[in-house]
């Protein structure tokens, strides 16, 4: 390869990445997932469009694995362990039982549609059986879903790859050797994948955390150390036959949930790297496919995709979540709909090609077609479906910017910046009148171009910029303090006419609003009553019906319900209440 060829590759690669970024601005306007647009750029530049011929499956496999490792590391860093209280076991059930059911149901129909053997059909089912972390993390961000739904989908997508990889590799081995039966040794291999992946991911994450916190480096080197460490854990786990995908996700989880040096620098760097990984991966996969090869299989492939989306996935979710009573029907329906397929099925479809199996190209084309249908149909309808099934909650007000204050190695202090508009509650109030969360301080106040020294008598005006020092756990309280007036209206429409304290006694609530207890202990706190009726760990947005009224969890403090909204039938708004 001469210098001219190398330079041409640099130019083409840079143009494709730049084109993907620029065209992605159409995503929000058209309502099309950004991943579909990037995939389309690759297809347009490929053999049937721009004429770029790319058929190196080994390179695609390399790029795909590298990209997924970075994406899962970033996803783990941003997942809060606190969300595990409501979603760990349901998500693991979906990641194992759910994938198995989807594989079997999809595989049987694939065998019938394409006149294949049962094992070949099951291989197709295994290839497309898992949801994709890149697609889920990308499309769920900023949608305002309740914690139970978001955590279930994110943990499932981060942990279901071992099952899909295990089934795919096992079925490829059976086809290559002519086997037709299953044996108990396969279960041990699956346990090995999960066990080794979990052990090395958690252990390696802890070791990497100690390195980051104990070694003094230039600030820009910490993110690189984290990425290098994550990739090393991914590769080592794969080398000893564990699940590298699970390991790198758990590594990120450990790093993201412990005090770590240069947290914001690491998160900002990983955010950019995750975007680059997604762009590179979907560009390569778009270049790899030959669009005209998809036309002959379009009708049966569409039928298979719709079967998986409308039948196989919902049934797998129904069975997988059967033991978990806290999930409402609308939450199960939404989780069933967001069975997003992305890069993982296409990468798994490369396995049969590299193994030289008959019909390998058919498997690849089918996987690509199903991913395309999934992203277009499920991805584009996600916001609409979330509203239809009522799984969204009013978003918490957020500062316009936030930055870390590295006052010591594992400092968790941050600087939050709020801009005060005319609709803010605190306009006209003196600073001494504000009930700030304990441990927070207003460090500076900007008015126009002028920096003011804030004192207790300083009166807030429209357009002021407030710089507040605090911790991440102070954000909800600060958000309420500096929230906009329209937010209060939204809260009341969602949570109800009044908001009560969670520790209010049922007897007092019943007397206040004229409700019947019907044998219920009057001394029971309202929060405990809701937990009993809900039959599971509560999250903001959970609702129960009692005495013809709707009671909604409005504010959580860790595992405890702090405030509860009550909504009365139209025309019946008795008694006083507390506004949120």
Curated annotation (Swiss-Prot):
Coiled coil: none annotated. Keywords: Antiport, Cell inner membrane, Cell membrane, Ion transport, Membrane, Potassium, Potassium transport, Transmembrane, Transmembrane helix, Transport. GO terms for biological process: cell volume homeostasis. PROSITE patterns: RCK_C. One of its GO terms (molecular function) is potassium:proton antiporter activity. Its main location: membrane. Pfam families: CorC_HlyC, Na_H_Exchanger, TrkA_C. It catalyses: K(+)(in) + H(+)(out) = K(+)(out) + H(+)(in). The chain crosses the membrane at residues 6-26, 34-54, 57-77, 86-106, 108-128, 162-182, 189-209, 217-237, 240-260, 279-299, 302-322, 334-354, 366-386. SMART domains: CorC_HlyC. SUPFAM superfamilies: FAD-binding/transporter-associated domain-like, TrkA C-terminal domain-like. It is found in: Cell inner membrane. PANTHER family: K(+)_H(+) ANTIPORTER NHAP2 (PTHR32507:SF7), NA(+)/H(+) ANTIPORTER 1 (PTHR32507). NCBIfam families: PRK05326.1-1, PRK05326.1-2, PRK05326.1-3. Belongs to the monovalent cation:proton antiporter 1 (CPA1) transporter (TC 2.A.36) family. NhaP2 subfamily. K(+)/H(+) antiporter that extrudes potassium in exchange for external protons and maintains the internal concentration of potassium under toxic levels. This is K(+)/H(+) antiporter NhaP2. It comes from Pseudomonas syringae pv. tomato (strain ATCC BAA-871 / DC3000).
């Amino acid at each position: 390869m001469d210098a001219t060829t190398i330079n041409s590759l640099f130019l083409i690669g840079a143009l494709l990445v730049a084109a993907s970024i620029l065209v992605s601005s159409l995503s929000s306007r058209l309502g099309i997932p950004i991943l579909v647009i990037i995939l389309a750029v690759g297809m347009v530049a490929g053999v049937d469009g721009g004429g770029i011929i790319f058929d190196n499956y080994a390179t695609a496999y390399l790029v795909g694995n590298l990209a997924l490792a970075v994406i899962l590391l970033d996803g783990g860093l941003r997942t809060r362990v606190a969300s595990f209280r409501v979603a760990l076991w349901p998500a693991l059930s979906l990641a194992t039982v759910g994938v198995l059911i989807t594989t079997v149901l999809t595989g049987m129909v694939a065998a019938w549609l394409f006149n294949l053997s049962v094992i070949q059909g099951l291989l197709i089912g295994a290839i497309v059986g898992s949801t994709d972390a890149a697609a889920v993390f990308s499309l769920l961000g900023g949608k305002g879903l309740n914690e139970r739904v978001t955590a279930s989908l994110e943990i499932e997508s981060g942990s279901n790859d071992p099952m899909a990889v295990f089934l795919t590799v096992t079925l490829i081995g059976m086809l290559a050797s002519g086997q037709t039966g299953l044996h108990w040794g396969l279960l041990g291999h699956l346990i090995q994948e999960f066990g080794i992946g979990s052990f090395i991911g958690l252990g390696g994450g802890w070791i990497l955390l100690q390195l980051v916190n104990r070694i003094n480096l230039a600030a820009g080197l910490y993110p690189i150390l984290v990425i290098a460490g994550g990739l090393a854990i991914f590769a080592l786990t794969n080398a000893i036959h564990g699940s590298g995908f699970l390991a790198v996700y758990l590594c990120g989880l450990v790093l993201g949930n412990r005090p770590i040096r240069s947290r914001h620098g690491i998160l900002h760097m990983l955010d950019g790297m995750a975007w680059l990984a997604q762009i590179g991966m979907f560009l390569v996969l778009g270049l790899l496919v030959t669009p005209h090869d998809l036309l002959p299989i379009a009708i049966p492939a569409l039928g298979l995709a719709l079967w998986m989306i409308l039948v196989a996935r919902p049934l797998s979710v129904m069975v997988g979540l059967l033991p978990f009573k806290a999930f409402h029907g609308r939450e199960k329906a939404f989780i069933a709909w967001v069975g997003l397929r992305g890069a993982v099925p296409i990468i798994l479809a490369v396995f049969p090609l590299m193994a030289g199996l008959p019909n390998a190209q058919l498997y690849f084309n089918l996987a690509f077609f199903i991913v395309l249908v999934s992203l277009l149909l499920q991805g584009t309808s996600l916001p609409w479906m979330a509203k239809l099934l009522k799984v969204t909650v009013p978003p918490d007000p957020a500062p316009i910017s936030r930055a870390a204050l590295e006052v010591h190695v594992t400092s968790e202090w941050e600087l939050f910046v709020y801009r005060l508009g005319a609709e803010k509650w605190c306009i006209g109030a003196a600073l001494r009148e504000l009930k700030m969360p304990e441990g927070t301080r207003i460090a500076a106040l900007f008015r126009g171009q002028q920096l003011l020294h804030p004192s207790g008598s300083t009166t807030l005006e429209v357009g002021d910029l407030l710089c507040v020092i605090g911790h991440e756990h102070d954000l909800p309280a600060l958000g309420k303090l500096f929230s906009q007036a329209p937010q209060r209206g939204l809260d009341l429409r969602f949570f109800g006419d009044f908001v009560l304290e969670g520790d209010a006694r049922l007897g007092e609530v019943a007397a206040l609003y004229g409700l019947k207890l019907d044998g219920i202990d009057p001394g029971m706190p309202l929060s405990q009553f809701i937990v009993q009726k809900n039959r599971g760990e509560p999250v903001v947005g959970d609702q129960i019906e009692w005495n013809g009224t709707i009671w909604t969890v409005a504010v959580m403090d860790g595992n405890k319900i702090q405030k509860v909204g009550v909504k009365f039938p139209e025309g019946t708004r008795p008694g006083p209440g507390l506004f949120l």
